[in-house]
Every structure is written in structure tokens, then in C-alpha cells.
Amino acid sequence: MDFALRQITERIRTATAEHTPLRLRGGGSKDFYGESLQGELLDLTPLNGITSYEPSELVVTARAGTPLAELEATLAEQGQCLAFEPPHFAPGATVGGMVAAGLSGPSRASVGGVRDFVLGVKLINGRGELLTFGGQVMKNVAGYDVSRLMVGALGTLGVLTEISLKVLPVAPAEATLVFEIDQARALAQLHRWGGQPLPLNASCWVCDDTAPGRPELLFVRLRGAMAAVDSACCKMTQVLPGTRMDNAVAGPDWLAFRDLHLPFFTQPQTPDNALCLWRLSVPQTAPVLDLPYAQLIEWHGGQRWLWAPPSAQTLLRQTAEQVGGFATLFIAAYAGTTGATARFTPLKPPLDRIHQRLKAEFDPAGIFNRARLSPSF
């Protein structure tokens, strides 16, 4: 056990003995996400570095504090990538934070999310024990896949120290098509395209308030073999008139979209500046939602963003639930505030009991990121 790992382990054991809450933190790029930030800071950035990388095996293992940008740069040198496009939000994003937050970028609906690429993890539980789950190969899992359990847990179950991930080759060709089309027709067309052998990778529908006439635009990104991408562009523009964008323009736009840096994600100016950014996760086949708020739609209809006040939570959550989804208050109106509005949709009692039992098993003293997922967790 190296010095950094030993120090962190000792700190956890002391905190458990003294019932001192700890706030786990890597680069802090996702401090805005979740409920409250409670406890003494436990800096995990000393746990950094890529410990194993086998390009031929499509597997990389990195310590939790490794900068995400560093990992992606190393993969790019070998023509490989994290296919789920994890958002950075800020320069300090780390591999551990990526897994703990469980957030994926524009390609999520086509390639899968973070949990689909996690092969194994090492973590320190609330007893100060170093545990290993999973490994460095893809295999059928018999029993509970604890590695993936850590994805999206926001550090509430343990301190991630090392993560093994599946990586993929960068697609040899890419194209972005843009169509002027209203929301209902865009969703219907995406569903039709989704049932065809097309190399769909990402999509985004938005009403462009910055352009004359406020056009409603659908952007579709294709990735795959050159012949497949070119053929798809021809087929799709024959069905629906559209334009192929220059990759030099589209590429930076998709990166900005991944990190929520597009103009849509700038908080609208209102008299009290009390609008929050909400994320509605719904089935791709969900229809146009009857909501009085402008939306940006991605994941071929499966994720819908909008700005609304905290008071809209009942409407948003009921609307999402009616179509089989849920709503998350992603960014609060004021930085560092939580207020009375729950960030995440409250769990049903049976599921909440499972969460509580898992918390009691991994973190019996309740010291890790207390109340980050919910006030009672």
C-alpha cells in the first residue's frame, strides 16, 4: 500500500471511530450535482495515475484521482476513447468523479452509459477495508455486480481508489447532419431511423433562440465506417432535406454540448434569476411533453433538458412519471443551495429499503458524503 492510499485509509478509520462525516472530492467539477456537501474534505487527487493500459485488450485501469483529460489524451494516442463521452464540466474532472456521478454524454443512447464500461473497481469501505470487485476482462457476472453499483452512487458507499474500464477504437468516420423540423416530427423521425441499420451516434433537437426566426433544429451525429456514414447521409437527406456540417464546426459544438456549455445551458435572465436546470429522463418513445418550458432533447428522445423554477417540481415529476421516466433538478438556481426541492426523485419504499441496507453494509457509520443522494442517506 503506497503512502497516499495508506493516509486515506487511516483517515477513514479515524473518521469512522469518531463518527466524523467526510466529503469525498476529486477535482470538484461536479460539486453542484446532488443534495448537500457535508463533512470534512477528503481530497482524493493524490490517488492518480494510469496503472495499466493494454490497447490490444481494449482495457485501461486508472486510479480515481487521475484527471479525466489525461486519461482521454492517453487513449487518443492509441486511437481509442471512452465511447460514452463522460462530461467534464470543468478542467479538474477525475476518473473517480466520472464513475461516482455516473453521467454520460451525447452518445449515451447509442453506445451505453458509464456502468456499461466499468469492468472492476477497488474501493475503501466505511470500515477502512480495501476491497476489490470485478476485474480487467469482460465476462458474464454471476451474482451482484458490485463494480457497477458504484456508478452514480456519488461516493456514498465507499472511496473509489482504482477503476478498470473498457475502451473502444475511435470511429474512422463521423458526420453531423442538421435538419429544420419541429419537435413532434423530429421525435417521430428519430424513432424511424432508430429502426434502420444506420450508424446513429447522437442527436440533439433544440429551438435556436439566437437565430432569426427561431428555427427548430435537429442535429444527428453519425459514426462508423466511412462507407456506412456516407451512405447514411445520402439516405437520411433523401427522406428529410438537411445539410451536412463541417466536422471542424460540429466537433467543438458536440464537445460544448457534452459539457453543457451551449447557449441553451446558460441560465435565462428573470427578475429573480430563480430558474433551475432540470433533466427529464424518459423512454425514447415518449411523446412531446405538455410542459410550458422550452426544451433541448437528446439521446434520440430519452433525455430532455429545460429551465424551470423549483416550484415546478410536482408538474415535472408527474409528467415524467406518466411516461415512465423521472425528473432531476440538475443545477440549482443559486450555486451552493439546495432548498426544499429534492434534487432526485424520491425512491419508492421498497427500493429505498434496498438502498439503506446497502449503505449500512458498505458504510455502517454513515460517514461518506452524507445526504448527497438524499437527506436520509
Give the positions of each predicted feature:
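Residue-level signal for inorganic ion chemistry
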Residues: 26, 220, 306
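Short, conserved charged micro-motifs
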Residues: 69-71, 184-189, 227-234, 285-292, ...
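Conserved glycine-rich FAD pyrophosphate-binding loop
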Residues: 3, 35-37, 243-377
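C-terminal substrate-binding/cap subdomain adjacent to the FAD-binding core in PCMH-type
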Residues: 100, 119-269
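Short active-site-proximal "capping" loops at secondary-structure junctions
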Residues: 27-32, 37, 47-49, 67-68
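Short acidic-glycine loop/turn motifs at beta-strand connectors
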Residues: 37, 55-56, 125-127, 208-209, ...
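Anion (oxyanion) recognition and catalysis
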Residues: 16, 76, 194, 320-321
